Design a protein with these regions (language model features):
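Hydrophobic core register within WD40 beta-propeller blades
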Residues: 72, 118, 162, 210-213, ...
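Beta-propeller domain segments
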Residues: 42-54, 159, 176-179, 193-198, ...
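Conserved beta-propeller blade signature
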Residues: 80-82, 124-127, 169-173, 221-225, ...
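Blade-level signature of beta-propeller repeat domains, shared across WD40, Kelch, NHL, RCC1
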Residues: 360-385
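Surface loop/turn motifs at the tips and blade-to-blade linkers of beta-strand repeat domains
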Residues: 62-67, 106-111, 145-154, 202-206, ...
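Acidic, glycine-anchored loop motifs typical of Ca2+
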Residues: 98-104, 140
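Beta-strand-rich domains and repeat architectures in extracellular enzymes and scaffolds
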Residues: 61-86, 287-293, 309
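Asp-box/WD-like beta-propeller blade repeats and closely related beta-sheet repeat scaffolds
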Residues: 131-165, 173-176
């Protein structure tokens, strides 16, 4: 069981959140040290992992139980993995000796507002909430990076994604506050800023709902997922993998999708600027979310610099699709093909028992995958048998 959380409120001050962080971390660390399990959130789940289909040599296991597990941020050399949610809670999975077996789960903070976007760097944790961006310092102090009143504050697509880029800047995806509609300001963009919040600017426009991005390890170019609009039929529009090779590009929304096909709501209206088409089209409504370029040495050599993309799964398609992890093979810095890597979270009866969200890599080269439906974080390993 998790420790009792302080009374939550969506508008807690940063000082109150900081005090909660320090109190909860102190309580949980004491509990772990004396050998109790009050902070562990493991052992209760019994997911049917045998239903999952992986390539030969690969294995998957439960790394930790985390309610509503969404975005992942690996910190402290893999000793901590922060886990965000779409509710009000923030967690951290501990693995002190980095053996790939979690020691416990800390309920780091509550009372946050959709703390989905996480980025860990230099001992600090950035949390992109729906309405602001804050930063946890190692001593528990909480600084405001972007205050309320600047970012759009809508629940629809209000779950941010965040990461620190090769340039040291913090990047945050801001979804459109609707299905298909007029947008303005920071809506439907990916923004970037200095770690202190200064020099805030729009990096990419025309982005409906990006919930994952990463930079190619060789070229340094950003690739991000984007979800196509709903209620246009089972087969359109495709989900996308986009290449942002430079700042200032427009990726079509809400005017066009895919290779320039107009959204019906904007038929006859040309985009204000030239748009950039996706480099990979996934099946419509598969809900492509997390993306990670493999950099490790555990997997076979031909996985290096390929991308893993999670598909959260459809919610209003006649025949459900997604609920799996895709592998996108890259050649010379560009996508060459795509294939299913792990499948089986969708049952034969058409009902899912898991919905994968984000993917991250531990220092040993194993992969972590979050599942907000099952409330789990999985670990995928490879052994040459």
């Amino acid at each position: 069981m998790l420790p009792p959380a302080p009374a939550a409120h969506p508008n807690l001050s940063t000082r109150e959140v900081g005090l909660m962080l320090q109190h909860t971390m102190r309580l949980c660390l004491i509990t772990l040290v004396i050998g109790l399990t009050g902070c562990a959130a493991q052992g209760g789940a019994n997911p049917p992992l045998e239903r999952l289909d992986l390539p030969p040599g690969f294995d998957i296991e439960v790394f930790a139980e985390v309610p509503g597990a969404r975005s992942l941020a690996v910190a402290d050399g893999g000793r901590k993995v922060y886990v965000g949610t779409r509710e009000r809670d923030l967690y951290a999975v501990l693995d002190g000796n980095r053996d790939g077996v979690a020691d416990g789960v800390l309920h780091v903070a509550t009372g946050l507002k959709v703390p989905n976007g996480l980025a860990a760097t230099d001992g600090r944790l950035f949390v992109a909430e729906q309405h602001r961006i804050i930063r946890f310092e190692p001593d528990g102090k909480v600084d405001i990076v972007v205050p309320e009143g600047i970012l759009p504050d809508f629940r629809h697509h209000g779950w941010r994604y965040a990461a620190v880029g090769p340039d040291g800047k913090l990047y945050v995806a801001i979804g459109a506050p609707c299905n298909i509609c007029e947008i303005s300001g920071f809506e439907g963009t990916i923004i970037r800023m200095n770690p202190d919040g200064h020099n805030l600017e729009i990096f990419a426009r025309g982005v409906r709902n990006a919930v994952g991005f990463d930079w190619h390890p060789v070229t340094g170019e950003m690739f991000f997922t984007d979800n196509g609009g709903d209620n246009l039929g089972d087969l359109i529009p495709p989900d996308e993998l986009n290449r942002a090779k430079e700042p200032g590009l427009h990726f079509g929304y809400p005017f066009v999708y895919g290779d320039g096909v107009p959204y019906p709501q904007f038929e006859g209206r040309a985009p204000p600027v030239e748009t950039t088409a996706p480099v990979v089209a996934f099946e419509a409504h598969a809900a492509a979310l997390g993306i990670h370029f493999y950099r490790g040495a555990m997997f076979p050599d031909d996985f290096r610099n390929d991308a893993f993309v999670t598909q959260h799964g459809s919610w209003n398609r006649t025949d459900p699709i997604g609920y799996r992890i895709m592998r996108v093979r890259f050649d010379d810095g560009l996508p060459a093909s795509k294939e299913v890597f792990v499948d089986g979270w969708l049952g034969r009866d058409g009902r899912p028992w898991g919905r994968v969200v984000d993917v991250a890599e531990l220092p040993d080269g194993s992969l972590l995958v979050s599942d907000d439906f099952a409330g789990l974080v999985y670990r995928i390993t490879y052994a040459d048998h």
